[in-house]
């Protein structure tokens, strides 16, 4: 999982990326291609 300050560019890397908010953190998840997972930090 990548940890980035800004997720907007990471979200654009794949069209199946979803922005999800869990426990106050913002994540990008991708069910089809899990290598695009990221967390804002």
From Swiss-Prot:
Pfam families: Ribosomal_L36 (PF00444). GO terms for molecular function: structural constituent of ribosome. The keyword ATP-binding does not apply. Keywords: Ribonucleoprotein, Ribosomal protein. It comes from the Bacteria. InterPro entries: Ribosomal_bL36, Ribosomal_bL36_sp, Ribosomal_L36_bact. GO terms for cellular component: ribonucleoprotein complex; ribosome. SUPFAM superfamilies: Ribosomal protein L36. One of its GO terms (biological process) is translation. Belongs to the bacterial ribosomal protein bL36 family. This is Large ribosomal subunit protein bL36. It comes from Rhizobium leguminosarum bv. trifolii (strain WSM2304).
